[in-house]
Amino acid sequence: MSKRNMNEDDRLEDFAVGQITLGGVTKTVYVAGSGPAVIVMTEMPGISPQVARFSRWVRDAGFTVYMPSLFGRDGAVPSAEEGAAVFQKACVSAEFRALAANQSSPVTQWLRALARLAHQQCGGQGVGAIGMCFTGNFALTMMLEPAMLAPVLSQPTLPLNDPAGLEVSPGELAAVRGRLDREDLTVLGYRFEGDRFCTAQRFAAYSEALGDRFVGRVLLDSAANTQTAPFFSRYVACPHSVLTAHLIDDAGEPTIAARDEILSFFKLRLGSSTSPP
């Protein structure tokens, strides 16, 4: 895949875009590729060029990418002010539980239905999903959908006001843990060591709740890209976005190693259109 300018809006011209209605709720979804389905959930403040780049990496690894528009301006490099406005709107949206621990965001119901639909459309063993930042925990809740097999949590940030809190109801968390044990599945998690939004306390809470079913990876702060878009420079003043804004797109970088581990995880659980027979 040729490198694009991450400082320019991404036209997303290589994705098929459509409206998908599930449970009476309609959202725009960008789809590309072939093979088993992987749902990529954007970080705040929306589908940036870096989020789209990650989706293309997943596509090129042999998967069908489903990238739902959950907030923000699709493909944009937003100003700090625009990004802050998107963040504030999402915090009070009925779809998200930004401040409350022990609750699951209502939008995860729609995302679980999307996983079920994607499995029907793409076939294969099941579906993978990755959430980032504001959506970071969503892939865990999506494990309540039987089609989901490969959840990845990248810098899960919610709830915002409880560093050790988990954005999932206790009953759903217990159900997910039971499924992980029964089916011998795991959850991958990623954060930077000095991330103030996704803390060590949160990863400790995941480990306590999920045991060795949670595989947490912590990257050194020195592995983070320091050249970021205005929103991140102003409002995210620490290493945070492992696979997008703070990823360094050079061979041998720890963030690239994290990307490759995730792609291998998807192939292990789902197979791919590039897997040998």
Question: Residue spans of the language-model regions?
Answer:
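N-terminal cap/leader regions of alpha/beta-hydrolase-fold enzymes
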Residues: M1-P277
